[in-house]
Amino acid sequence: MAHDHDHSPPADLGPAFRWAVGLNTGYVILEGTAGWITGSLALLADAAHNLTDVAGLLIAWGAAVLAKRAVTERHTWGLGRATILAALFNAIAILVGVGAVTWEAVQRLSDPVAVPGLTVMLVALIGIGMNTGSALLFMSARKGDLNAKGAFLHMAADAAVSGAVVLAAAGIMVTGWDWLDPAVAIAVSLLIAVTAAGLFREALHLSLDGVPFEIDRAAIADWLERQDGVQGLHDLHIWPLSTTRTALAVHLVWQGGDPDAFIDRVTDALANAHGIANVTLQLERRPCDRAHAAVAS
């Protein structure tokens, strides 16, 4: 018997995405215009990078919208998996962007390019405010939603890059050391890569139906086996339906009294304690001869 408990529906991130897309689009126009007027390749390159951020936000936003669509005959779990794929895309996009910045920075270390320090600093200061504001829009939802976490990291990474650009520009204006620009870019890129790698690992794990990192499968199995009337279990599977919803299915060898009361109690406990929204329990009066070996994921 399957029970669906949506005790904690995902937050409506529509307003956050609207503001973030609007702010980033405006900044791309500003930065691209400043780069074209000053002839700064650095600003033009960063404007192109921020344009990919807008694309990433639009994909994450679209996935969040799809996740709320009702189930259909063809998509019986709904389209929540789109949020996992969006998080995976964002992680890859961040890593690719960081790799491109690092490659360009390494090239410039051997042949530093003079940059218009004051103009770059002013544009970067605006970028700090815009990206920090965008990141804060997703801050509260990032812990419970990997899709929101991907958007948050995208914006936080850009804010960090803008901060590094300000420091580098200030240093160049004071010392005249043009190599500070690529050196700082490399340092920040490495820090961002570490965080993005964690997002990529988790998103890839979930996209392959892995048990969400915050759920202890062994502990749940132990808890189920200790319930009244349970003689054993097999085929325990836990997998993500989206970045915010999880499903569980298990066969229980059970010799209790009222099956409906037992199922209600167990499904409520799993929903409240572990946030597992959809639970399917198959009760068996004796061990099933066709039981498959439990697969730990």
Task: Show the residue positions of the predicted features.
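The first (N-terminal) embedded transmembrane alpha-helix
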Residues: 20-30
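Short, hydrophobic transmembrane alpha-helix segments
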Residues: 33-44
